[in-house]
Regions:
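NTP-dependent nucleotidyl-transfer catalytic core
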Residues: 1-207
Length: 208
């Protein structure tokens, strides 16, 4: 017998009945780990929570596609690589393997797809270019920033207003920004750091 599924909608802060856009192919995307250090209990929580949801959905719908990304390029990864005298590739492969082993130990199923960030740099560059074209982002000194004020619904999911954001807390302060709350989409890389060619010079994606 089919059962109704209720999930908390962050936008309304209410429990609402789950109605998929396509009952023949339910899709879920989950933000995965940044693989710079050994997995900890904070990494395990979303794995378990969304594994439960995945299994419930599979019980109710014929096809469920579960995607969970791996962030394998990041400032923390570069820092850890240098501190431990290990290549970024060896470090990220080691931590990814450790993470997947922990998932097995927790009896969590593998997602259908587990894309690595570095496998999709070209798509990120295309998306950033489109944001610049539409006026939502800007380039300055080989950095590209998202201009938060241009997006009127920014903070809607977290119920925070733009003027409540404090520069210098979780927001990186930089003279390259138009506004303190703007966040980086593309960073220039130092000569000893991984980099990809882009319209703004060699660099790597930024995370928010």
């Amino acid at each position: 017998m089919s059962l109704d599924i209720f999930l908390t909608n962050n936008l309304t802060n209410k429990k609402e009945k789950f109605i998929p856009q396509d009952k023949t192919n339910v899709r879920m995307y989950v933000c995965g780990p940044t693989v710079y250090d050994d997995p900890h209990i904070g990494n395990a929580r979303p794995v378990v929570v969304f594994d439960i949801l995945f299994k419930i959905l599979k019980n109710e719908y014929p096809n469920v596609t579960y995607v969970r990304n791996i962030t394998d390029i990041d400032d923390k990864i570069i820092k850890s690589s240098k501190e431990n005298n290990i290549s970024i590739l060896d470090l990220t492969n080691k931590i990814t393997q450790s993470f997947n082993e922990d998932c097995i130990y927790l009896n969590c199923e593998k997602p259908n797809h587990e894309p690595k960030a570095t496998e999709h740099i070209s798509e990120m560059i295309q998306m950033i270019s489109e944001l610049i074209k539409k006026g939502f982002a800007y380039e300055n000194k080989k950095h590209v920033y998202f201009e938060v004020k241009k997006f009127k619904d920014y903070g809607k999911l977290s119920n925070k207003k733009l003027d409540e954001l404090v520069a210098g807390s979780r927001i990186e302060v930089s003279n390259n920004k138009k506004n303190p709350e703007d966040f980086v989409l593309w960073n220039p890389s130092d000569t000893d750091e991984p980099s990809w060619d882009s319209p703004w010079g060699k660099g790597r994606p930024g995370w928010h």
